[in-house]
From Swiss-Prot:
An example Gene Ontology biological process: fatty acid biosynthetic process
Catalytic reaction equation(s): apo-[ACP] + CoA = holo-[ACP] + adenosine 3',5'-bisphosphate + H(+)
Subcellular location as annotated: Cytoplasm
Signal peptide: none
Chain sites annotated for binding Mg(2+): 8, 57
Cofactor(s) annotated in UniProt: Mg(2+)
Gene that this polypeptide is encoded by: acpS
Any one GO MF annotation of this record: magnesium ion binding
UniProt-recorded name of the protein: Holo-[acyl-carrier-protein] synthase
């Protein structure tokens, strides 16, 4: 049974601007070291950062908590499986709330076009 859905859309230009400004503190606050390493290694790194940010926002919307109840940005991490499919790994408080809600599955879809990055998360019991 579906527990919640979340969708978020982000302008990639916002992350291009953050990169140009050298706003490392912002990236360190939102993204895990693995996410930073992955995104920084890509030709269009702003696009990859925007997608990961949208994924985290989408998860928070699907869970219904937003960024409160002790959840931090780094409690969620976007990773790719062997075939490149994005998945959301949960840690600490995000994982705890996921389990408390009796959830068993988290589905993530990412896409980008026309300067925007979009993510959708479906949480299932």
């Amino acid at each position: 049974m579906i527990y919640g859905t979340g969708v978020d859309i982000v302008e990639i230009a916002r992350f291009e601007k953050f990169l140009q400004q050298g706003n490392d503190a912002l990236f360190d606050r939102i993204f895990t070291p693995s996410e930073i390493e992955y995104c920084s290694s890509k030709k269009h790194s702003a696009q990859h950062y925007a997608l990961r940010f949208a994924a985290k926002e989408s998860f928070l919307k699907a869970l219904g908590t937003g960024l409160r109840d002790g959840i931090s940005w780094k409690d969620m991490e976007v990773v790719n499986d062997q075939l490149g499919k994005p998945e959301l790994k949960l840690y600490r408080r995000a994982e705890e709330l996921f389990r408390q809600a009796g959830l068993g599955a988290c589905f993530l879809s990412l896409s980008h076009d026309a300067g925007c990055a979009v993510a959708m998360v479906v949480l299932e019991r």
